[in-house]
From Swiss-Prot:
Alphabetic keyword roster: Acetylation, Cholesterol metabolism, Disulfide bond, Endoplasmic reticulum, Glycoprotein, Lipid metabolism, Lipid transport, Lysosome, Secreted, Signal, Steroid metabolism, Sterol metabolism, Transport
Residue positions with a glycan: 58
Paired cysteines (S-S): 27-140, 42-47, 93-99
Protein role: Intracellular cholesterol transporter which acts in concert with NPC1 and plays an important role in the egress of cholesterol from the lysosomal compartment. Unesterified cholesterol that has been released from LDLs in the lumen of the late endosomes/lysosomes is transferred by NPC2 to the cholesterol-binding pocket in the N-terminal domain of NPC1. May bind and mobilize cholesterol that is associated with membranes. NPC2 binds cholesterol with a 1:1 stoichiometry. Can bind a variety of sterols, including lathosterol, desmosterol and the plant sterols stigmasterol and beta-sitosterol.
Gene label: NPC2
Record keyword Transport present: yes
Tissue: Epididymis. High levels are found in the caput and corpus regions. Weaker levels in the distal cauda and in the efferent ducts.
Predominant location category: secreted
Subunit structure: Interacts with NPC1 (via the second lumenal domain) in a cholestrol-dependent manner. Interacts with NUS1/NgBR, the interaction stabilizes NCP2 and regulates cholesterol trafficking. Interacts with DHDDS. Interacts with NEDD4L (via C2 domain). Interacts with NPC1L1.
Domain comment, as recorded: Binds cholesterol in a hydrophobic pocket; there are no hydrogen bonds between the sterol and the protein.
Protein name: NPC intracellular cholesterol transporter 2
Gene Ontology MF term list: cholesterol binding
Signal sequence interval, chain numbering: 1-21
Length: 149
């Protein structure tokens, strides 16, 4: 019985490492459903993003439509103003997704979020959208972050 309890605790606490699923706000996934969002490393929320480092982003989602293409658009929202947040690869078809995207299929989107040294130390909201054909939102999520030196 003790072994069973110990095994359960290990499984339950195993996801408390350097990153894992984060709680997010869906900001309009009109033609898709987000199954899970992982930001690594992000052991606690709000995620603390350190200047000069890069963070991996993995979004598992299901598309409700077919789409020939996908494009990521990322913003930092500061005081209600959306400021473009450049990422290394905006083409979702080069970020873990085998295009064309098929209806009712689940995908794992992978990308990096680089935090440049020139960014100010500030609290903000990261908004990340993946757009399909005709700019339809395959997914859109927001999480609060803290950029630190």
């Amino acid at each position: 019985m003790r072994l069973l309890v110990a095994a359960f605790l290990l499984l339950a606490l195993g996801d408390l490492g350097p990153g894992g699923a984060v709680h997010f706000k869906d900001c309009g996934s009109a033609v898709g459903v987000i199954k899970e969002l992982n930001v690594n490393p992000c052991p606690a929320q709000p995620c603390k993003l350190h200047k000069g480092q890069s963070y991996s982003v993995n979004v598992t989602f299901t598309s409700n439509i077919p789409s020939q293409s996908s494009k990521a658009v990322v913003h930092g929202i500061v005081l209600g103003v959306a400021v473009p947040f450049p990422i290394p690869e905006a083409d979702g078809c080069k970020s873990g997704i085998n295009c064309p995207i098929q209806k009712d299929k689940t995908y794992s989107y992978l990308n990096k979020l680089p935090v440049k040294n020139e960014y100010p130390s500030i609290k903000l909201v990261v908004q990340w959208m993946l757009l399909g054909d005709n700019n339809q939102h395959l997914f859109c999520w927001e999480i609060p972050v803290q950029i630190e030196g």
